[in-house]
Design a protein with these regions (language model features):
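C-terminal alpha-helix
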Residues: 127, 177-185
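Amphipathic alpha-helical packing segments from all-alpha helical-bundle domains
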Residues: 60-61, 77-84, 88-89, 108-133, ...
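Short linear capping/connector segments at secondary-structure termini
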Residues: 65-69, 100-107
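Helix-turn-helix
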Residues: 4, 8, 12-46, 50
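Hydrophobic/aromatic-rich alpha-helical bundle segments in the mid-to-C-terminal region
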Residues: 98, 102, 110, 114, ...
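Short hydrophobic clusters on alpha-helical segments that form packing/core surfaces
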Residues: 5, 9-13, 59, 86, ...
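Hydrophobic alpha-helical connector segments
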Residues: 50, 64-92, 147, 172
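Alpha-helical DNA-contacting segments of helix-turn-helix folds
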Residues: 48-55, 116
Length: 185
């Protein structure tokens, strides 16, 4: 029943947005009574928390897996593949990303997004520390922070804005140039 409610909550959030998200709508979408919903979740905030937690967890898993699979690689191909994995993870549910990034009050997803950034940043810092000879940046943790936030923000804006002048391949090329230029400067 919990899975059904969470799936319905995700659907309601995407279809109606944050402002119209309610336990009654979620219960209707789940095909249960509001009373049944309250047996599992005390309020709409609890449902939102699970939906948002799972969303960022899904994104984190995809990106961490892509980075882990390429940990032995170095150079433009690795950057491109990892950025491509991030784009794919964000595109997997573009509409939920839109609601999470643009409609939810910042406090609702800040901690979860920060956890994703921290996880990827730690992997990137470890990766850069193991390849100090391949970069001119003195501190792997600082370099990882800059690279992860730059790539993440570019990816999110591209997925949400879908700029006609910037194709996916063009964006990936620019990300590779940005990261490569920064790490080698």
């Amino acid at each position: 029943m919990v899975e059904r409610i969470v799936a319905a909550g995700r659907g309601v959030l995407v279809e109606h947005g944050y402002d119209a998200f309610s336990t009654n709508r979620v219960a209707t979408a789940a095909g249960i009574s509001p009373g049944s919903l309250y047996q599992y979740f005390p309020d709409k905030a609890a449902i939102l928390d699970v939906v948002i937690d799972r969303y960022w967890e899904e994104v984190a898993e995809r990106v961490a897996a892509a980075l882990s699979e390429r940990i032995a690689d170095f150079g433009p191909g690795m950057v491109r593949d990892t950025a491509d994995a991030l784009l794919s993870a964000l595109e997997a549910d573009r509409e939920l990303l839109r609601v999470v990034a643009e409609e939810l009050p910042i406090h609702r997803s800040r901690e979860r997004r920060a956890a994703l950034e921290r996880r990827v940043r730690e992997l990137a810092a470890t990766y850069l520390a193991a390849r100090r000879e391949s970069t001119r940046r003195p501190d792997p943790a600082t370099a990882a922070w800059v690279v992860v936030l730059a790539v993440e923000n570019l990816a999110m804006r591209w997925v949400l804005d879908q700029p006609a002048a910037v194709t996916r391949d063009a964006l990936l090329d620019e990300m590779v140039a940005l990261v490569g230029g920064y790490l080698l400067a």
